[in-house]
């Protein structure tokens, strides 16, 4: 039997000491901003939405946007939505993060400590929901269930940025740029699995800027020394010579976890 020599370093799990994910940040920034751009488009009546302009006009209130998750995706979505004049709420379970967002985002962005009850209270008059919850290396939690769809008005738009991690809406399944949406119980679902792929020029440059230092380190030092010198890169290791060395990945796929020495 041929020995498996694959060394796999995963972008999503390269993690710095402050728990930031440097190789995921660029695509998260793009996806967060695109989620609002796409959400606004599918709120238009010809696209199956309510026919609401995200920022409203004088005398007509703007759309209400609920963003689930205040990380990089969520904060960029909030910044974009606020800039377009929407009524924005960001929900998260990290109070420190909520304080930071409250201090740094525009004043038309409100923060909310997330719970099932509080999310349910927001749904009846929400127009656009962005799902942006990330658990590194693991599946996203389902924050909106099938039953909760009935609490929203027909034409409400759900954008599931977490679809790459399984989605944070129970009714989500991956879609494509050529067929980005589907409707369940009157609710428009947008769940494109590679949102940044719609803007490849911007996405490629942003990702290259973040990736290049790691590529140079790997090329100059080899993977062992590069990972030894940089703990963030070492955390990105998922598979080494056929062994799964990242616990969350092993758990998700029910594989044996073999920590690297």
Where are these regions (language model features)?
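Electropositive phosphate-/nucleotide-binding environments in soluble metabolic enzymes
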Residues: 26-33, 71, 75, 91, ...
């Amino acid at each position: 039997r041929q020995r498996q020599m694959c060394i796999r370093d995963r972008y999503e799990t390269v993690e710095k000491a402050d728990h930031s994910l440097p190789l995921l940040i660029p695509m998260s920034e793009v996806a967060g901003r695109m989620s609002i751009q796409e959400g606004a488009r599918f709120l238009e009546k010809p696209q199956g939405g309510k026919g609401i302009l995200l920022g409203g006009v004088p005398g007509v209130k703007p759309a209400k946007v609920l963003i689930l998750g205040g990380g990089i995706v969520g904060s960029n979505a909030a910044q974009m939505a606020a800039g377009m004049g929407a009524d924005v709420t960001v929900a998260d379970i990290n109070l420190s993060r909520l304080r930071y967002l409250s201090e740094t985002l525009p004043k038309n962005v409100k923060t909310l400590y997330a719970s099932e009850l509080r999310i349910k209270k927001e749904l009846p008059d929400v127009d656009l929901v962005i799902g942006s919850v990330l658990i590194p290396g693991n599946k996203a939690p389902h924050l909106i269930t099938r039953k909760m769809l009935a609490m929203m008005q027909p034409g409400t738009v759900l954008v599931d940025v977490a679809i790459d991690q399984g989605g944070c809406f129970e009714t989500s399944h991956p879609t494509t740029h050529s067929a980005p949406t589907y409707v369940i119980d009157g609710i428009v679902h947008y769940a494109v699995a590679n949102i940044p792929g719609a803007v490849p020029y911007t996405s490629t440059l942003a990702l290259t800027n973040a990736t290049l230092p790691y590529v140079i380190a790997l090329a100059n030092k080899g993977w062992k020394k590069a990972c030894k010198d940089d703990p963030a890169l070492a955390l990105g290791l998922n598979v080494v010579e056929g062994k799964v060395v990242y616990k969350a990945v092993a758990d998700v796929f029910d594989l044996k976890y073999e920590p690297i020495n």
